[in-house]
Amino acid sequence: MNNKVVEKFYEKYAWIIFLGIGIMVLAGAIPHMLGFNTDPALVETIGGQTIDELKLSSPMFFNLYNFYFSSGGLSDLGFGFFLIVISLFAYRQGQKWSWYSFWFIPAFFLAFMVLSSTLPSESQSILYPPLIVLIILSLAGLLLPFRKFFPKKH
């Protein structure tokens, strides 16, 4: 008698969704952490000045901006790292705690959307599409392997 459970393809490989999200977050975090703004148009839309104009007009405020910008990148680096490690090991193996903890991911991106709703509409149109994609992907990554984490009771 063979008691081996055969996983469906989408259950077995859903962890790759979170691995991909983690890699994207990590890739964006590195220049962010080093102080390289990869979207200067967003800064200009929100602040009304280019980064260079901000640096010239208010060096102290620019230092504050740069500190928070770089430390946000450091936070993203940690977020991406843990996302990658958990998806590669615990989530891939079907450990329930990882499924529960990964509900933070769509909640995080949804909270980012809510926070972004206070920005000018031009900024929202830049931020919303990738956030919506990340929310949908993370929900798919949670719901596709549901039976892997919570098998039917016979």
Question: What are these regions, as identified by a protein language model?
Answer:
Residues I21-F69, S75:
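Hydrophobic transmembrane helix segments
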Residues G80-Y100:
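Juxtamembrane helix-break-helix junctions at the cytosolic face
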Residues F18-H32, D76-F79, L83-I86, P106-S116, ...:
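Helical transmembrane-bundle signal
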Residues I136-H154:
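Membrane-water interface at the C-terminal end of transmembrane alpha helices
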Residues M1-K8:
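Short, Lys/Arg-rich, polar N-terminal cytosolic tail immediately upstream
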Residues A111-L131:
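Membrane-helix boundary connector in multi-pass membrane proteins
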